[in-house]
């Protein structure tokens, strides 16, 4: 059965569903850092602890991260809009140029952790499954950290980034 709508309509309607915003970071085969903004990060399982996300198949950033053994999902705060867009656009000057001027650290497994992130979820890559023009990346959580004092979480809603505060 063929869909009776185009991709613009699909995106517009699904934009009514708020999604969290993370920057998935990793290192390529040479150890150079890379990152990509993701709005499709999900919890998959508590036992074992699994998470997932859906990068676009054409993403150069994901192709660099996929060369490594893992990734770190950096949960952004509503104050980190610049970081959101920095990692959403194709970088000028190479993949690691996105990290220029950032005081980032390394997770226990060596993945980049962005400064001021609300949480960092350090994972090994379990599997990558094709899903249309995207892939589903399943990660096993190895380490977790949260910074409760940095602010409200960033969400993407109806084409814009905003924040959400716990009730």
Label each residue range with its predicted role.
Residues 1-167:
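Basic, polyanion-binding surface patches
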